[in-house]
Structure formats: C-alpha cells, structure tokens
Amino acid sequence: MVNQQLLDYIKQQLQQGMNNEQIKQSLLANGWQNTDIQEAFNTIMQVPVQPKKRRWKKIVLIIIGVIIFLIVGLLFLPKILNLFAKDIAPINDSDLKLQKVLVVDKDNAYFDLIKLGNVIYEPKDKSQTILDMVAGKTWDNQFAEEIISRNMQAFEYFAQAAQRPKYQNPESADPANITLNMILTPMNSWRQMARLSAIRALYLAKQSKNKEALDEALNSVNIGQKIQESQATLIEYLVALVMKEVGLETVQKIISSSKLTNAELKQYSQGLDKFYKNENGLITSFKVEYHFQSRAIDSIVSGDTEVLKSVVGEEESRNPEIAKKIKTYYYFQPNKTKLLFAEYARVNIKNANKPCGEIKATEVKPLALTNPAKLYTEENAIGKIIYDVIAINLTGVITKKCQEDLLVGATQAMITIKAYKNDTNNYPASLSELVPSYLSSVPRDPFNGKSLKYSATKKILYSVGEDMQDSGGSIGDDWRKMTDPTFKINF
C-alpha cells in the first residue's frame, strides 16, 4: 500500500513545478526506497495534477473581474439608487409662513436710519476711546464735544427715526423678496450711532440736562424696539438688541446722578414697560430665516448656480459631481431637506416661547456622514450637507433676548429705587416696598420667573442667571458674563 505521506509530498512538489526526476532524487536522498517512490508516482499519474501556476491565473482573473464589476457598479450606482429613491410630499409649513407688511414711507424709521452711513463721524483711531467712554471707564470732555458737533445731522436723523411709529426694511416686507440674493442693508452705522448717542446723553447729563440726556439715551432703545417688532432678519434683530442694551445701560448711568423729580422718574420707569415685548419679533426673525432656507432649496432645484455657490462655496459649486447629484433624487430630496429646516425653526420658536430658565442648549448635530465612501451611499446626502452648512445653534440668541428682558427690569427697578431714595433718603428694604406707589409690580427675573433679586446692604440688583442658583450676586465688569448678572446701584 502506497504511503499517504509520500503521496502528499509528491503532489505538493508537482504543484510547485518540480519534475519527477528532481522529486525522486530528493526522496532517495532522504532514505525513501526506489520501489516505494515509483509506486507513488504510478498512483499519482492516474489522476492528473494541475500545476499551481494555473490556479493562480484563475484567481487573478477572478480578482480582475470583481474589480471591473465594482467599478461598473459604482458608475451606475446613482442610477440604480435613483430607481428606489422617493422624496416625501411637499411639507405643511403654514405655521412658518410670512405675510406682506405695508408701512408708508413717512411712518418708516428705516428711511432715516439708512441716511446715517453717509453723515456719521466716528474716527477709526478713537474706536476704543468711544467704547471706554460709553462703558464709563473714562471720559474725554473735549472729544465728546467734537463727536457731538461733527454729528449734528446724524443726531437729527436718529431722533427722527425714534419718533417714527414703525420700522420695516422694504426688502423683507414682502416674502417674495426674501431670498439669498436679497441685498442686506448695512447696519454697522446704526450700532455706531447708538454709541455716539450714548456719549451725547452722558455729556448732557454732566451738564445737568438730565431729561434731555435720558431722552437721547432712549432714542436707541426706541429704535431697537421698532426694529424688533418688524418683519426683520435675524441680523437686524441682533443689531436692535445691541442698540437697546447700549441705551438702557446709559439710562442706568444717568439715573445715578440725575436730579429729576419723582414724577419724572416714575414716568420714565413706566415707559420702559413696552420694551419687554420682544418674543414675537424673535419668532418672526426665525421664520424669516426659514424663508431664506426654503427659497434657497427651491433655487437650487431650479438650477440657480449663484445660490448654490453661496451655500456650498464657489469651489464646490463648480464640481460637476455636485451638479449631477443635485439632479439625482437619491442624493437630493428637496422636501425632506425643507422638513429638516422646518423642524429646526420650530424648535427655536418653541424655545423662544419658554421661560428663560427652561431653555436648554440644543446641539445641532451634523447629519451628513464625513466618510466619502459612506456618503456615496447616503440618501439625501446633498440635502444633509446643506443643512449642516446653514444650521447653527441659536440658543445663544434666545439667551440674549432673556438678558435684554433682565436689563429692562433692572433699569426699571433702579429708576424707582432712585425715586424712593429721593422721598425717604433711604433704600427700600425690599423691592416689594416700591409697589404700588412707585411700581405696579416687582420686575421679574426672566431666568426663574420670580422677583428680581435686590440687596439694600450690597446696593445691587441681580438675577440668578442661567444656572438659576442664587449666589448673592456677582462681581465683575460685564454683567453678561457673571454667574449672577449684577447691576450696581451707584447713588
């Protein structure tokens, strides 16, 4: 019987390309008998053994075939996937729709404000000096007089804008005009004017012209409120917020040294009530942003290359693969993409209506896969990329709205404490002592919905802040950055 080990060895050597004589000599050298070797050869010859080289050729051919199949498959994958792709029906976004707003030019503060850019005077090398003067860190009387004398025309336009009953940017008055191609009004001069107005107000206060000073400071607040009550973009809303903050902080500084009568102080305090109403304006600005996004998607579908460029960037917009995928339902599903933005807007609107203490930071998680290979098979990949590029976390904007409410309440309380001190030559033990003689109700802390905090001994008004923990007030230069946003009573 032929030895199986010998058979296996000979087969192995044959597969590796050795001939019979080479195998035989090797076996003889290792002690195998010639008769056993010959018998093994005879057995093997009955079943032909294919050399290993032929098996490798077959494997190579199989690999090449698989590669070709994959390449062809990838080339035709979009068309194959497109057969199974299906966008959802047009979404119901009626809750996010905007209406056409009509404001006659003579009632519109917009047309006064746009004149500021041509007449405003603010030396660039004095920007920090202006900021320090507004913040109360320094005072340069000569420079203040220069600012006032060189900006008389600008102050006139600003006062006229404050007296107009309404504000409405004509570009966003009609929803049909709200597109990514809409020309945005430059508003930097409006923020500049709020700072210059603050300097003028502080200058008037130093001249003991307290009523004129307060009226000047409140111009910024009145204009900011009008902008917030309009159909405004988010950028306009934020500019308005800054203008109101500058004006209200200036009011607090003027009150400290004012000689106004109690009747006048009460009148100014009551006049601040209207400045709490800013939620609807913020909600409208969120709807305007959604309108931008929805119209952008429509424009991309229609082949508007300029809109595509503004969304994905100039380099990517020239990429033929991007243009090809936009026309492929699998990679770009407009209605599903609109739904992403609609839900994003609704979350922000819901947060804007919540008490400030209940607002939780919402993380905008990227939807598109970062792996290029996986992205190639990702449904609505282009839509998700557009969402990732445009959607940002707006919780901070809502927090700023809450801070604005706090600033209004703190300013209101400070004015009435001043009136109380004028009457009694003392500070109230609590804010409730101001009701009803000086206040109709105690101002609320927007972060916990309870009464604004007050300490007669520390001479401070403060909020519990975003963490809603009462730490007894905080110390610092900027109340916005404090754990307990705190306002000093400097009188």
Which positions does each model-derived feature cover?
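Eukaryotic low-complexity, mixed-charge intrinsically disordered interaction/regulatory segments enriched
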Residues: M1-P48
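Short acidic linear motifs
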Residues: Q50-I63, I67-F491
